[in-house]
């Protein structure tokens, strides 16, 4: 059986591990997109360290959880958002203004919606976390 969306599967696994109180989550298969999303989550303080472990197949990410995540998930379909339209999607995916973040794929790489708004770029919504 193949995975239809590895990013959605990985974020759902992180959310489930957080909710049951685990300290570590193992995400497989690993991909560059999952690694970049984990990097943004680490920069914003939602997860601890993470590392890529080669297993001879697709690889595994070992993620240290620190209890900061209430919910995270992938945005499907990946909506195209202009730099002045982020507020509409904040209302849709985040519980309150200024609480949580949207991760956006922009021409300048993956970043949070606040960074994209400050840089004046739009992109496609990848995931949300709070």
Swiss-Prot record:
List, in alphabetical order, the GO biological process terms annotated in this UniProt record: translation
Q: What is this protein called?
A: Small ribosomal subunit protein uS8
The family assignment reads: Belongs to the universal ribosomal protein uS8 family.
- Which InterPro entries does the record match to this protein? Ribosomal_uS8, Ribosomal_uS8_CS, Ribosomal_uS8_sf
Gene Ontology cellular component? ribonucleoprotein complex; ribosome
The answer to whether UniProt assigns keyword Ribonucleoprotein to this entry is yes
**Described purpose of this protein according to its UniProt entry:** One of the primary rRNA binding proteins, it binds directly to 16S rRNA central domain where it helps coordinate assembly of the platform of the 30S subunit.
Q: Name one GO molecular function term.
A: structural constituent of ribosome
Looking up Pfam families in the UniProt record yields: Ribosomal_S8
Listed A to Z, the keywords are: Ribonucleoprotein, Ribosomal protein, RNA-binding, rRNA-binding
The lineage's top-level taxon is: Archaea
Its quaternary organisation is: Part of the 30S ribosomal subunit.
Q: Which gene encodes it?
A: rps8
Q: Which HAMAP family match?
A: Ribosomal_uS8_A
């Amino acid at each position: 059986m193949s995975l239809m969306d590895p990013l959605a599967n990985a974020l759902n696994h992180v959310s489930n591990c957080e909710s049951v109180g685990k300290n570590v989550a193992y995400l497989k298969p690993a991909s560059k997109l999952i690694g970049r999303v984990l990097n943004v989550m680490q920069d914003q303080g939602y997860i601890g360290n993470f590392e890529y472990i080669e297993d001879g197949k697709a690889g595994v990410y070992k993620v240290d959880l620190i209890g900061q995540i209430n919910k995270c998930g992938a945005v499907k379909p990946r909506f195209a958002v202009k730099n002045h339209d982020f507020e509409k999607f904040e209302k849709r995916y985040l519980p309150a203004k200024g609480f949580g973040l949207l991760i956006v794929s922009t021409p300048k790489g993956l970043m949070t919606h606040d960074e994209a708004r400050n840089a004046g770029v739009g992109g496609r919504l990848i995931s949300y976390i709070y």
